[in-house]
Amino acid sequence: MPHIISRSPRMPQSRHPAGVPADGNIPPGVIRVIVKTPGNQNVFTVAEDTSVRQFKEQLSSHFKCQMEQLVLVSMGRLLKDHDTLSQRGITDGHTIHVVIKSKHGSRSLTHSFRNLLTNNPCHQDRNPKGNSSTVCQSAGMSETKVESSILMEPDASKVCTQDPEVGSPEQIEQMLETLCVQRLLSNMFFMHQLPPEHPDMQDLIQQNPEVSHLLDNSEILCQTLELARHLAIIQEIMQIQQPAQNPEHTLNPQPYLGLETIPNGNIVLGQGYDNFNDHMLNGVHVHDLLEDDSFTALLAEQVLEQVQTPSLCQPPPQEQWGQLSSSQVIFANSCGFLTTPTEANLNTTNNASRENPAIAATQGQSNVCAVQQPTEIPSLCTIPVIQEPREGDKDTTIPQGSSAQWLEEDLQQSEEQSSSQITRSMIQLLRTHPHMAAEMLLLLNPPQLNEQWRQQTATPLQSSQLSDLLLALANPKTSQALLQIEHGLQLLATEAPALLPYIEPYLWGLGWLIPSSCDYLDTVPWTWNVQDTVEPQCPESCHKSGTVLQREQPLSGDSSHSLQAPEVRFSKEMECLQAMGFVNYNANLQALIATDGDTNAAIHKLKASQGF
């Protein structure tokens, strides 16, 4: 059994502890240990190989308490019973802080902090003659004789009475700003030793396993305590998490922090984010995602005065159809985001359609996209599209892997049907006014494309090619410019035929070859108007041009010309060639037969035979 000498903190005049020789000489293998409690300080002389358990036995007899109530702390670390003082680096002159736990049971760490640090954050050595120094010094520094630790009272009633306002935010903030607490919290080894000594902390960690992560990282622990100092943030987090904890809980009508500074933010953004939070936490459903469309209004730079939660974007009533223009498209979703296949009802066709136009104007929840249309263009067939959800899709959940496939199919279907609808409308318009089709075909008349054109006329035009051609010619200014060019060339051939030899190469390259004998009665530029358009007048000797007639016949599907004699079949082309100065009847006929009635190719062939 080691020899332990306990003396009071009173120091003799020689400033050496009692029981120690005046000369200060200590026998080898014996060390002096300063034992500090919140209310007293003692110096013990023990052997350096003394175990912590043996030292606790002597301290328990000295303080008249049970050994289980003693907690020894040195250099910020708890001393375990199986350790020795030398193993823990305790040498002569070191300080060991003693914590005596209450007999009524273990108190929580927070309660101990409140009782101790709120009233006496940094206890100092009560001995005015001794080596007094504060407890709040750097932990882990072996050069100093005083180490930092947490000081708890043997009995809470001996030191202070519990302050009824200790739990206030101000008191908690002062406690956390104390240097003792900050240094103690930065010591992760000490924090790991707290749960075994406090059953209430063990219960807390068992019920909430995520709390154990706080004890592994001092930075996270400090951030958590910093967050705990701001009760407003904690209340806001609780409000946000309240719908997640209770799915049946009604949405919190209170706005989020900071939304009151945004115009109408309490109405639009508050409920929008509330709905989005509920949708993400309670499961993503189709009808939930399409329920609130406030983002559409934000994209259109409009702030809704009132945000409601209607059913799936109901279409406007039937009586409102008359107020909508023929090109307006009503769609139930904004930008086609994660939607299931829907059925669309068309006025002119029964085909399904999915339209995804750009948002031009948004009014309320109806989501009407108005497509402006020039006044000069004739109105096409009305294409109102109303998307109505299937009854079976209202309560279905979107699979994760199928949304991209649905979106791709919808875009492809939308492109095909929009193209087919425009093509059908333009074809109907051209059938009503066949002279427009004849003028359009003048664009595709270069001699080097004649063979390609004959191959194309043998089979119907591709839908995409015809759509591009019709869309390009749908502009009234384009059609008017083409007609003016043709009219000017015809006037040039009539008024100044001497210039034709110089411009004929350019006319051939552009596909224009106008007989010089053609005379148009109307010399005023035309205005493209489908309702009042009158076919231009031309003598019977030159009806339009050979190119136009050549290409109108395959398109019209009339096969009777193949049974006629070449003289009858190419009679009009022959007249045009004669009017241009080619008087050899047989040569003209052979050239037309060889070129299958192509007037431009026949002229080129005749000029080559004449050496031009």
From Swiss-Prot:
SUPFAM superfamilies: UBA-like (SSF46934), Ubiquitin-like (SSF54236). It comes from the Eukaryota. CDD domains: UBA_PLICs, Ubl_PLICs. Residues 1-25 are annotated as: Disordered. Residues 564-609 form the UBA domain. One of its GO terms (biological process) is ubiquitin-dependent protein catabolic process. Residues 31-105 form the Ubiquitin-like domain. GO terms for molecular function: polyubiquitin modification-dependent protein binding. GO terms for cellular component: cytosol. InterPro entries: UBA-like_sf (IPR009060), Ubiquilin (IPR015496), Ubiquitin-like_dom (IPR000626), Ubiquitin-like_domsf (IPR029071). SMART domains: UBQ. Signal peptide: none annotated. Pfam families: ubiquitin (PF00240), UBQLN1 (PF23195). This is Ubiquilin-like protein. It comes from Rattus norvegicus (Rat). The gene is Ubqlnl.
